[in-house]
Amino acid sequence: MNEEEHNKSVHWSIVYRQLGNLLEQYEVEIARLKSQLVLEKKLRIQVEKELESVKTKQISSSASSKVSSNTIQELDSTTDEDEIPGSDTVDEEDPSLNAPFSEKNQSVKIPPHSPTLPVQNASAFVKPISVPLGNVKEEKFLDTNPIGAESFESSDGEMHLRARSPEDMILLRETQPLAPLDINTLGVSDNRQKKGTEKKRPFEPEFLNDDVIRGNKRKALPAYECPDCQKFYELHGPVKESSVAPTWNDENRLGGGSLPNCKHQPLVQKVGRHRKLNIPKPIPNGFWESDFVD
């Protein structure tokens, strides 16, 4: 068994040699295929050139055949026009054509005229000419206006303006354009309010300090001291609880007595203390000073 396995095994040098031979064969085959590709490309270029030359020849031959056919048709038409019956008689010169103008006028006799009546014996020298209606061509009247060529290209607005008087034309051209302007091209928005389309919005206060909060909610608000109110209190001094500002009313005037103390008077001592949801900004220094500058 060992001898059989030894015989089946192949040395690595033999395998290496076989692989080298295969690689050489592949390289030779690749070189052969590349040479075939080069030859095929050359043949393809030659065939394309031959096809282009054949196409140009066909185009030139077709153009020459068309030109020759047109010339033949023109020659046929000219020969048909020359072979008109009675053309030999036309070539003969008419002796009356070469006659002078005075001799031609002598053959025409002018009938006598009367001062009040129309021409007499007009049928003697005027021959009625009968022309078939089919041969008469109706000619359209041409526009004698110097701007007639431009009138076909003008707009409807300009045609309406031309029908007006010159004075109206001047006023219209000075006050308004020839055509209405488009608002979208001017970049101006249409600010006209549409009635009934806008819904009524709920009222929203413009200022933050307009809200009024009372009761227990007011106690929960943050307290702050206003320096301006405190300064006002210091300048005017505290108001005594026992004293009340005199008021000139009917009771004082008649009875001469003094009014009882007001229950809101102790609150004056707490001036400068505030409670608000949104604390306002402080007033700048010197805002309330009204002294005249020297």
From Swiss-Prot:
The modification Phosphoserine is found at residues 77, 87, 114, 151, 154-155, 165. Phosphorylated by tel1 in response to DNA damage; promoting interaction with nbs1 and recruitment to DSBs. The keyword Ribosomal protein does not apply. GO terms for cellular component: nucleus; site of double-strand break. Keywords: Chromosome, DNA damage, DNA repair, DNA-binding, Endonuclease, Hydrolase, Meiosis, Nuclease, Nucleus, Phosphoprotein. GO terms for biological process: DNA double-strand break processing; double-strand break repair involved in meiotic recombination; double-strand break repair via homologous recombination; double-strand break repair via nonhomologous end joining; gene conversion at mating-type locus; meiotic DNA double-strand break processing; mitotic DNA replication checkpoint signaling; mitotic recombination-dependent replication fork processing. It comes from the Eukaryota. It is an enzyme of class 3 (hydrolase). GO terms for molecular function: bubble DNA binding; DNA end binding; DNA-DNA tethering activity; double-strand/single-strand DNA junction binding; double-stranded DNA binding; endodeoxyribonuclease activator activity; endonuclease activity; flap-structured DNA binding. Residues 54-108 are annotated as: Disordered. It holds the Pfam family SAE2. It is found in: Nucleus; Chromosome. Residues 56-69 have a biased composition (Low complexity). Residues 77-95 have a biased composition (Acidic residues). Its EC number is 3.1.-.-. The modification Phosphothreonine is found at residues 78-79, 89. Endonuclease that cooperates with the MRN complex in processing meiotic and mitotic double-strand breaks by allowing the endonucleolytic removal of rec12 from the break sites and ensuring both resection and intrachromosomal association of the broken ends. Specifically promotes the endonuclease activity of the MRN complex to clear DNA ends containing protein adducts: recruited to DSBs by nbs1 following phosphorylation, and promotes the endonuclease of rad32 to clear protein-DNA adducts and generate clean double-strand break ends. Belongs to the COM1/SAE2/CtIP family. Interacts (when phosphorylated) with nbs1; promoting recruitment to DSBs. This is DNA endonuclease ctp1. It comes from Schizosaccharomyces pombe (strain 972 / ATCC 24843) (Fission yeast).
